[in-house]
Amino acid sequence: MLPSLQSLTKKVLAGQCLPEDQHYLLKCYDLWWNNAPITFDHNLRLIKSAGLQEGLDLNMALVKAVKENNYSLIKLFTEWGANINYGLISVNTEHTWDLCRELGAKKTLNEGDILQIFIDLKFHKTSSNIILCHEVFSDNLLLKKVNNLKMRIEIFWELREIIEKTDLLNNEFSLNTLLLKYWYAIAVRYNLKEAIQYFYQKYTHLNTWRLTCALCFNNVFDLHEAYEKDKICMDLEEMMRIACIKDHSLSTIYYCYMLGANINQAMLTSIQYYNIENIFFCMDLGADAFEEGMALVGQEGYEPIRNILSLKIYSPATTPLPKSTDPEIIDHELKNYFSKNMMVFLTYDLR
């Protein structure tokens, strides 16, 4: 729809960085949401207000306004360029549905529309967005229009490491449960602290899932928060196994090692999952399970790892890492870490 002169004026005003003593102007123009002024980043198409410091994409802001039956903001965001069809995903009253139709929305969303809206809305990895996605899509009857397999493929792709190598997420779960675990996992993967706390407080039965995601996605900060502060427990060797699922998971491997997990077992798990950087890191920490590793790679397809393990050139790193489970220290030490034994292998291979 074509924006009115008034909505264009509001758009310009919302793009200004007004001092606090001029916020009354924004309130006069209905640029007010959750008892705070609305600002609009024109380039990023982000709406910001109280509780939305990270901002919401314009389409997601419309979804939230529709969910809250905020008619003035529904009209405003639509005039600013939001896709009114997105509002149908969260409409919950007949009056709001009628308003969306007046503003140009389709009579109904088809499967392709719903799936595309789901893909678009989950794109922005912020706490505000992930929490709202959870609230909007949880028990949403419109999802019944979407082929169940298509939805599951969208969820499984981003969580494929956990799905392939643990039994904590599978096709036996309902779509609603899968979505809940998906949003929680995304919050942990991207260290969205506000969203993590939201899910932790609301879904205590998923504490093990939180710990699993922190281990698998190498989030040593939330791992420490969950294990040390929130006292979420798991068998130490199982923690190390999960940490070795993905390659480049040095921080969570080291954290588990500092807790006392077996570094030789970590090396063998990394071999099993074909995670070469993890293997060299375990060697740096003193792992020497070469014979067991060679037995493990006896099967076809492990030739590069067999070549690595066959050489008698490795030894523990001479400069030890700090003996600490402080996530800040671990992250600082390992952010730009390059394995001493990997360097030995690479230079040996070049001779």
Curated annotation (Swiss-Prot):
Protein family per UniProt: Belongs to the asfivirus MGF 360 family.
Keywords, in A-Z order: ANK repeat
Record-level GO BP terms: taxis
Pfam families in UniProt: ASFV_360
Keyword Hydrolase: no
Transmembrane listed as a keyword: no
ANK repeat residues: 57-89
Domain of life: Viruses
The protein's name: Protein MGF 360-12L
Source species of the chain: African swine fever virus (isolate Pig/Kenya/KEN-50/1950)
Cited InterPro entries: ASFV_MGF360 (IPR002595)
Entry function: Plays a role in virus cell tropism, and may be required for efficient virus replication in macrophages.
